[in-house]
Amino acid sequence: MKKPIGILSPGVALGTAGGAMSSKFFLMALATFFSFAQVVIEANSWWSLGMNNPVQMSEVYIIGAQPLCSQLAGLSQGQKKLCHLYQDHMQYIGEGAKTGIKECQYQFRHRRWNCSTVDNTSVFGRVMQIGSRETAFTYAVSAAGVVNAMSRACREGELSTCGCSRAARPKDLPRDWLWGGCGDNIDYGYRFAKEFVDARERERIHAKGSYESARILMNLHNNEAGRRTVYNLADVACKCHGVSGSCSLKTCWLQLADFRKVGDALKEKYDSAAAMRLNSRGKLVQVNSRFNSPTTQDLVYIDPSPDYCVRNESTGSLGTQGRLCNKTSEGMDGCELMCCGRGYDQFKTVQTERCHCKFHWCCYVKCKKCTEIVDQFVCK
C-alpha cells in the first residue's frame, strides 16, 4: 500500500545555474576548463561530518555554542547559517552522511572503485572532481542518507522543530484501520535535506555555459534523485490489535524503507545513468537525444569515468593493486576484471568463525570456535 505524495510535484525540469561574471574572470574560467577539462571543487565537504566519532559529535552540539558551526570543517557559508539556526540538527546531518558513505561502500565493494575514503575533509578525494557516474551516485546516496536520518530523528523526538509524521491518510487504507501512529517525518526530512545539502551548490556562481555550471546542475539533479528515492520508497506500516493477536483492528503510519533498499535502487540508477551536456541555453540535455530524457529520479553525469585500474594522483584513482578478488567469479569481483589483466597472487590465511552452535534452556546460545585455512587472491 503506497503512501500519499504530499510535497513533491512530478516532472520538475533541470534548471539553470548562472550569475554575471566579469570578462576577465570568464576568460580565466575558460582557460581553466580547456587546460584541465575538470571542475576545481572545494577540498572540504559536509560529508566530513559523517567521518567523526558519533560520541564526539553528540558532545559538541551544545545549544548556544556559537563558535561551533564556524569550526566545523566542510560547511559552506549557507550551511553554516543553517547550522547556527538548527544546531540540534547537525548530529543527524553527520549520521546521514555516515549512512550514505557506508551504503556507497557496500554497493561498490566488488567494483574497481569501491567508494574508498581518504584521510582529509574531502572524504572521497580528487575522484569527486570528475563529474562521473560514480560521483553522481555518491551525491545521491549521501543526500538520501540525510533525508533518512532527519526523518527518523523527528519521529524519535530528537529535534525541537519537528515531530511525528503528519502525512495524510492514504485513500486506499481500509476505513476500520486507524491512521496516526508515530510515523517517520519524511516531509520534514526531505525539506531540510534539500535546504542544507543543496546550499553549497546554490551559492556558487559561475558563467552560464561553463563546465562549473554544468557540475552544479549535475550535483543538484543527483541530490534530488537521492531524496526522491527515499521519499518514494517509504510506505505504510501497520500494527495489529485485538484479542490473542486476532488483528481485528490495525493502527498504521508512514515508515521509511530500509536504507539498503534505497541503496539498491540508486545502484540500479547508477547502472543506467544518463550522459549529459550543456546546451546553448545553459541547461543539461542528454548526449544521445534518441534516449528518453532522465527523470528527477534518474542519475546523470557529464564526464566519463577515469581508469580505476591504476593509481593516479591527478584523478584520485587508488587503483586495484592489493585488492582481494574472487578467482572463480566472472563478475566485477572476479580476479580477471578486478585486477585489470595484471594477474594476482595467492596466499593462505587462517579464518576463525563460530560453529556447532546449540541453544540451551533458558535462554542462550553456546558456540564453539572453528578455524580453517582458506585460499585468498590479491591483485598484483
From Swiss-Prot:
GO biological process, one term: positive regulation of macrophage cytokine production
Signal peptide: 1-37
Disruption phenotype: Mice display perinatal lethality and display gross morphological defects in outgrowing tissues. They are truncated caudally, displaying loss of the tail and a significant shortening of the anterior-posterior axis. The shape of the head is abnormal with truncated snout, mandible and tongue and reduced outgrowth of the external ear. Fore- and hindlimbs lack digits, the genital tubercle is missing and chondrocyte differentiation is inhibited.
Main location: secreted
Consequence when changing N312Q: Abolishes glycosylation
PTM text: Glycosylation is necessary for secretion but not for activity. Palmitoleoylation is required for efficient binding to frizzled receptors. Depalmitoleoylation leads to Wnt signaling pathway inhibition.
GO molecular function terms attached to this record: chemoattractant activity involved in axon guidance; cytokine activity; frizzled binding; protein domain specific binding; receptor tyrosine kinase-like orphan receptor binding; signaling receptor binding
CDD domains xrefs: Wnt_Wnt5a (cd19347)
Disulfide bonds listed in the record: C104-C115, C154-C162, C164-C182, C238-C252, C240-C247, C309-C340, C325-C335, C339-C379, C355-C370, C357-C367, C362-C363
Domain of life: Eukaryota
Cellular compartments annotated: Secreted, Extracellular space, Extracellular matrix; Secreted
Family affiliation: Belongs to the Wnt family.
PANTHER family the record matches: PROTEIN WNT-5A, WNT RELATED
Functional description taken from the UniProt entry: Ligand for members of the frizzled family of seven transmembrane receptors. Can activate or inhibit canonical Wnt signaling, depending on receptor context. In the presence of FZD4, activates beta-catenin signaling. In the presence of ROR2, inhibits the canonical Wnt pathway by promoting beta-catenin degradation through a GSK3-independent pathway which involves down-regulation of beta-catenin-induced reporter gene expression. Suppression of the canonical pathway allows chondrogenesis to occur and inhibits tumor formation. Stimulates cell migration.
Subunit details: Forms a soluble 1:1 complex with AFM; this prevents oligomerization and is required for prolonged biological activity. The complex with AFM may represent the physiological form in body fluids. Homooligomer; disulfide-linked, leading to inactivation. Interacts with PORCN. Interacts with WLS. Interacts with glypican GCP3. Interacts with PKD1 (via extracellular domain). Interacts with TMEM67.
Name of the protein in its database record: Protein Wnt-5a
Encoding gene per record: Wnt5a
